[in-house]
């Protein structure tokens, strides 16, 4: 998983710099994961490796697509997790997502505390939760999020995805 980890570091650096994970990183990551799974995974026929890889890609997309649909995340972050899924299949994608969510939460809290804007962002958090529960139209939620974006602190989510996933890989012994 060294290739995936190196790709994640590059994506995180670019996301931190430009607030964007470019397609020239995510699409090759997805396709190379499919190719790797179809040709290099021992113990599986090519079609089964490819099937698990595509399933992992779909799980990665499904986990972050709702946040993207309501304007809470960029498409590059969604495709980055899909790329992870292409390489490590569905089960490890779930664990990488969980680790990334924990890291993202910690970073978000630290950012708010560092700027000393806890109460402002706490009230925005509850307002967003209320909107998600009451406004059922994803397009309206995305429009509301776009209006609010200039007042929000932005977290380039490629960073927590990279940190969380690499920490998970290390803990699971996948970097050996």
Feature-to-residue mapping (PLM):
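A membrane-topology feature that recognizes alpha-helical transmembrane segments
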Residues: 1-176
